[in-house]
Amino acid sequence: MKDKKIYKIIFIQLGEIYEIFAKQIFQSDMYGFLEVEEFIFTNDDQLVVDPSSEKLKTEFNKVKRSYIPIGAIQRIDEVIESGEAKIKKTS
């Protein structure tokens, strides 16, 4: 059985650093974009909830696929397990 890959994608949007997790990433047919599908978010059963994580869940709630400009991407890692998606201010 082939293991499912999980990717951590870090990119900049509107002066903020987004850190999201997804199961699928592809080079898009649209020149200069990366396709991201099957977003992964942590469970809601935590006692302390990060507001930026909740903002991301709301922002990507009904999104099937997102196209991120290649120039906005800072880093892509293949990780063993997903973490909490978050938004940070750029310094």
Enumerate the predicted regions with their spans:
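Eukaryotic intrinsically disordered, low-complexity regulatory linkers and tails enriched in Ser/Thr/Pro
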Residues: 1-91
